[in-house]
């Protein structure tokens, strides 16, 4: 499943599989400019930190076309900077969004004073590189994560950190796929439904079912019972931002799952690329938490389920403290506490690999 993010150079169009209507409908959403891309990000046509980063990289290319339309003018650089900042602010929690925009911006600045067409050509190559890198990174995460999984393990996951949330293969689901690819047998998955947007029930179950990996959907509030009954051996989740100390922001409800895992002696792992680790954020206290529209909670489809006038908390993410995390699975291996040190070593190793 690696065709859910596509870019047509000929049509200058970013094509996204619309995740809002999965699993019952498979249809594409077309982004022709920055406004379309921001809409896709904010309404969760595309979601998941790595996938957001890849989308943002292509969105920068659309921004360049837009800044020069109908023809390059004296102010195109200023206009492009404005469009890039709008794109970077589309969703506040997922650090890969700004990471991708800043990577594209740094390529631009390294070119001196390029003309617009030269910049666009270079950016398209860079966006495609980011796209392909993420696929390779996720497979590396899967290989490292597979070492944590034994035959007959039942793995609980929360939200969707699979192929749909990345360029392909997945982070948390990459660990599952990596274990299966490594020959582990009897692997099963419990996908928490993940209210209110139901990424687990709709997307994780969709992916794994397509792959033939046994998956069972569970109500979010059944986690404790399932663990208490010995039905869960590992928990593996993704992340939208990881602080320098190892605190991890992920879909709302993840913190509760981590607490339950600790109570029942079940290892709780986070799987994410190094690009999701924000070393400029000291701890989870500094991670901004997005609030989403109340209608996601007050309505099921078109039907209202809460009384008019009753307020709603609809935080999209929570932060799991580092002390609840047994390991962070990255492309550089499984990081262990203390995370400040192991994160620093992982980045140093990655820098060495690139040099």
Curated annotation (Swiss-Prot):
One of its GO terms (biological process) is L-methionine salvage from methylthioadenosine. Substrate binds at residues 47-49, 91, 199, 250-251. The keyword Isomerase applies. The active site is at 240 (proton donor). GO terms for molecular function: S-methyl-5-thioribose-1-phosphate isomerase activity. InterPro entries: IF-2B-related (IPR000649), IF-M1Pi (IPR005251), IF_2B-like_C (IPR042529), Initiation_fac_2B_a/b/d (IPR011559), M1Pi_N (IPR027363), NagB/RpiA_transferase-like (IPR037171). Pfam families: IF-2B. Its EC number is 5.3.1.23. It catalyses: 5-(methylsulfanyl)-alpha-D-ribose 1-phosphate = 5-(methylsulfanyl)-D-ribulose 1-phosphate. It comes from the Bacteria. Pathway: Amino-acid biosynthesis; L-methionine biosynthesis via salvage pathway; L-methionine from S-methyl-5-thio-alpha-D-ribose 1-phosphate: step 1/6. The record marks 159 as: Transition state stabilizer. Keywords: Amino-acid biosynthesis, Isomerase, Methionine biosynthesis. Belongs to the eIF-2B alpha/beta/delta subunits family. MtnA subfamily. Catalyzes the interconversion of methylthioribose-1-phosphate (MTR-1-P) into methylthioribulose-1-phosphate (MTRu-1-P). This is Methylthioribose-1-phosphate isomerase. It comes from Oleidesulfovibrio alaskensis (strain ATCC BAA-1058 / DSM 17464 / G20). The gene is mtnA.
